[in-house]
Amino acid sequence: MIDIERLQWYYDNDRVFITAHAAERFRQRGIKVKDIRNAVKTGEIIEQYPEDYPYPSCLLMGLSVKAQPLHVVMSDEGNASRIITAYFPDVDKWESDLKTRKV
């Protein structure tokens, strides 16, 4: 299982990578790298995806620099992490806590 402290350590040690595709999606969604960093620093893991390939990943919820809830999907590659995607959670898809998916 991935833990938030490990993801925070990756950030503190410049071991987090963002693909060009993910960076383009952030721009489209109005998300800045500093928002993602803040979300990781303030966040908690809300879902684990241990079977993801090629590396396990997780969904965390934290706050942007403007204190907006932000979801970030990150991998744990053993010695680094990759940002897979980030988005502002949609209240139509998430319960009011923004941590629980609606069914």
What label would you give each PLM region?
Residues 1-103:
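Ribonuclease/tRNase effector modules and their secretory precursors
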